[in-house]
Structures are given as structure tokens and as C-alpha cells.
């Protein structure tokens, strides 16, 4: 049995449906990070042959497999120059001839929709109630569709200009349009003021979870609160159990998510490994028994 199988579009969709966390965005990641594969039907991998970066998600789809063995097998097969790994547990800082250049710990925050009081009554929601009402008084409106416009690209460009982005962030941003074009499930939640786009979220849906992988906003007051409140209402109306807001990322973003009653459901360690010029080699790959192509869709 092949250890790594190439994933077709239909297989990606199935991974998204059966996943619990990072697997939800397999289709999106496959457009941003490279050709998608699955290791023993459990761990997802994406290989970008241009940058020679291998992305591994060690969150489990089916059962459990040895994570270190997955990494060793992947490095032998793909021969990457760099590894980017997300995992629910800590990893060694040196692996198969790769040394860790960067590590981060984070938590994924989600709102439990059935227990959320959408009326925003009471002292707990006083600030949120004010911000939502402030946005409504200013005339913000929401439109849900799948259409990217020059306004979307302009807001993304402004976001990129104001930040020093990692390569994988830029790759995700560039993949939004194609994700909407190739897959049926994602939607755009667009906020407007007097007919002009002022911000938007990319939203997707899997089983009982509604997830927001990316959001882009101008500096319009109370904008993020307005959009999130509308998304909570949408999740309520469509009987979703969880609204996934993503990683905490920073103390300010984490505080925002906590105010909206989001709780950490998954612990994440993110590692960036670079190939070492000396030390233990990674060996040679006998790919005939490691990699299997699933053919065209």
C-alpha cells in the first residue's frame, strides 16, 4: 500500500467533510501551498515544487499514525528545502537533517453557536451591543456572494502593504479567487457603506462547523464586530454548532475573540524547519512504494 496518495478534488472535499480542524481547508491549502497528498489516510501534505517547501498538517483524519515517521517518510520522498508543520503536540527541534528556524504556539478559537445569545442582552455583551448598534447606525450593510471585485483586490493589497507577510500568507491571499471558482462551498461575507466595499470575510462550511479562514477590513469603526455578528446570526439560522474564528495570532485578536465568547478548542504548534548543510542526511527515497497518484478527477 502506498504511504502517500495524491488527492483529487473529490478526495479533497471528502477530507474537508470528515476533518475536525486544519483538514477543513484542504481544498484552499491545495491551491496555495502546492500539490495535495495524504499519508496513510491520516495526515495531509502539500508540496510546492517551485519553492521546494513541504507543508504537513499532523492533525488526524482517520485514527492515528506515528507523526515522526510521517515526517521522515515525507522528507525522503519530496526532498524539500524547507518544512512547515502544524501539529497538536510538540516536536523535536532537529528532524531528519532539518533544524528548526522558527516555532510558534497558538490556539484555535471557536464560538459555540447554540449557547450564544444573539440578542446581546445583559452586561456581558454591553460593549458588543454598542459596537453592533454603532455599525448599524453608520449604515453598514452585509451582502453574501461568491464574486471577487476590484474592491476586494484593493482591500487585500492595502492589507499586504501594511504588513510584512510570510510567503505562505501571500500564497493564501492569491488563492482566494481560485478557491471560490473551483469549490462550491466557500462564500464571501461583504460589508458595505454607501455602496462601497469596506471589508469582507472568506467563509466556508463543513458538517456542523462554519469557519472563517481569512478576513480583510478597512479602518471603519466597529466593522469587525458588525461582520462577526452577522456571521453568528447566519450560523444560528443554518443550525451550525461551531463558528471557527481561527488562531489567536496576537493578544489583541485573542481578546476580540474572547469578548465574542469564543473558546480555544485546539492547541497548535507551528514549526518551520530548514535543511541543514551538515549533519545527519535524510537518505534516499524509494518512491515506488511511498507515492501513489490517484489520477485526474
Predicted regions and their residues:
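A short, internal acetyl-CoA/4′-phosphopantetheine-binding micro-motif in the GNAT/acyltransferase core
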Residues: 57-66, 114, 214-222
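A conserved beta-strand-loop-helix scaffold within acyl/acetyltransferase catalytic domains
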Residues: 2-51, 96-103, 120-221
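Aromatic (often tryptophan-rich) hydrophobic motifs at membrane interfaces
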Residues: 71-74, 185-281
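Acyl-donor-binding surface of acyltransferase catalytic domains
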Residues: 64-141
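Active-site/acyl-donor-binding loops of N-acyltransferases
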Residues: 2-10, 98-120, 238-297
Amino acid at each position: 500500500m502506498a504511504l502517500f496518495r495524491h488527492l483529487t478534488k473529490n478526495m479533497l472535499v471528502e477530507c474537508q467533510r470528515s476533518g475536525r480542524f486544519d483538514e477543513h481547508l484542504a481544498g484552499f491549502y491545495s491551491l496555495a501551498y502546492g500539490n495535495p497528498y495524504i499519508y496513510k489516510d491520516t495526515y495531509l501534505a502539500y508540496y510546492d515544487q517551485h519553492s521546494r517547501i513541504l507543508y504537513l498538517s499532523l492533525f488526524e483524519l482517520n485514527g492515528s499514525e506515528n507523526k515522526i515517521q510521517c515526517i521522515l517518510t515525507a522528507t525522503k520522498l519530496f526532498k524539500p528545502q524547507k518544512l512547515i508543520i502544524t501539529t497538536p503536540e510538540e516536536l523535536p527541534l532537529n528532524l531528519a537533517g532539518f533544524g528548526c528556524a522558527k516555532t510558534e504556539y497558538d490556539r484555535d478559537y471557536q464560538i459555540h453557536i447554540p449557547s450564544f445569545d444573539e440578542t446581546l442582552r445583559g452586561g456581558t455583551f454591553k460593549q458588543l451591543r454598542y459596537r453592533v448598534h454603532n455599525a448599524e447606525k453608520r449604515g453598514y450593510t452585509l451582502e453574501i456572494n461568491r464574486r471577487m471585485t476590484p474592491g476586494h483586490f484593493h482591500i487585500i493589497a492595502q492589507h499586504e502593504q501594511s504588513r510584512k507577510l510570510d510567503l505562505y500568507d501571500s500564497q493564501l491571499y492569491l488563492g482566494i479567487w481560485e478557491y471560490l471558482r473551483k469549490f462550491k462551498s466557500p462564500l464571501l461575507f461583504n460589508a458595505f457603506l454607501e455602496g462601497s466595499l469596506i471589508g469582507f470575510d472568506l467563509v466556508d462550511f463543513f458538517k456542523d462547523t462554519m469557519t472563517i479562514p481569512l478576513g480583510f477590513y478597512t479602518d471603519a469603526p466597529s466593522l469587525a464586530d458588525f461582520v462577526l455578528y452577522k456571521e453568528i446570526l447566519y450560523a444560528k439560522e443554518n443550525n451550525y454548532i461551531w463558528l471557527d474564528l481561527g488562531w489567536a495570532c496576537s493578544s489583541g485578536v485573542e481578546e476580540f475573540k474572547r469578548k465574542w465568547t469564543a473558546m480555544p478548542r485546539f492547541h497548535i504548534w507551528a514549526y518551520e524547519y530548514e535543511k541543514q548543510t551538515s549533519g545527519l542526511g535524510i537518505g534516499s527515497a524509494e518512491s515506488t512504494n511511498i507515492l501513489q497518484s490517484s489520477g485526474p478527477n
